[in-house]
Regions:
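Acidic carboxylate-rich catalytic motifs and surrounding loops in phosphoryl-/glycosyl-chemistry enzymes
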Residues: 148-151
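A structural motif corresponding to the C-terminal lobe/cap of the Radical SAM core domain
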Residues: 86-89, 97, 113-139, 145
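Conserved AdoMet/S-adenosylmethionine-binding subsite of the radical SAM
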Residues: 1-108, 113-114
């Protein structure tokens, strides 16, 4: 940063206050995941409720220079128009103006294998077609936010 480099961090926002306060002030861009607005769905998919994440997200946007919410769009989990309406409202409530729709893919499987962990998303989940991702982009745009597929 001192040498003029732009800095960014990608986070789930599931961390301690100390970590947020130690890192976020020095970052130009925070790319923050949002897997589900529903605490039960989030817990089923990730193993933790999103309550702490939502609180941390509010802290992060107060400290960060810029935040973009990124939605790994997973069929059977959050690939529903209603959920994208809720995500857009969540982004607006935080003062975040940009959402990235990230179509689900299975490229993360190899990371799990390298770490010796089980890939719990399941092999039966298929990648999200681009035209479906475009529907979700249009939902976010309808809330007056910026939105791209990918990012």
């Amino acid at each position: 940063k001192a040498q003029g480099w732009d800095t960014a961090i990608e986070t789930t926002a599931y961390g301690t206050d100390e970590a947020i306060e130690a890192v976020i002030p020095y970052v130009d861009l925070v790319l923050m995941d949002c897997k589900s607005t529903d605490p039960e769905v989030h817990k089923r998919v990730t193993g933790v409720s999103n309550e702490k994440i939502r609180k941390n997200a509010a802290k992060i946007v107060k400290i960060a220079n810029r935040v973009i919410i990124r939605v790994p769009t997973i069929p059977t989990v959050n690939a529903f128009e209603e959920e994208f309406h809720r995500i857009a409202e969540f982004a607006k409530s935080l003062g975040v103006d940009t959402v990235h729709v990230l179509p689900y893919h299975t490229l993360g499987e190899s990371k799990y294998e390298m770490l010796g962990k089980a890939y719990t998303m399941g092999y039966e989940i298929k990648s999200l077609p681009r035209d479906e991702a475009e529907v979700f982009r249009q939902v976010v745009l309808s809330h007056g936010l910026n939105c791209v597929v990918g990012g």
